[in-house]
């Protein structure tokens, strides 16, 4: 079940994830061989453990997310919370959507703009393919795209527009309703 909360030597992180990893079984085995004990069978736990493992040798959670993104393969968007930061990340192909919203001094990350409408938040922008955004009270929104090799082209999942997304959503600036 998500969100997943993980307590580890450097603190606590929460993670929610939309998508699928094509190399989750290999990553899971790698972690198990080094002592990880999993509580679930979900991809999200594999991602959380990789971020926690990378955090041991990183100066920040967002750096650990970037390092983990070089190992995980598939179509995904991630939301990671630490006690002081909200972090969003999108796979290098941009297969799964992720956007930023704001209401007053609060920020939101969501896979659909209609979720922002529901809580009265304004759409700020889409998270770009391969981008990590870090939101903190001290610095607002920061962006990093230096950690992941970019593919020549982005890709979109047609099922996002046809089956998953609500018609009143916008994905990467495109109205889902107009795509139907």
Task: State what each model feature region is.
Residues 1-129, 134-180:
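Conserved short alpha-helical segments that host acidic/polar catalytic motifs at enzyme active sites
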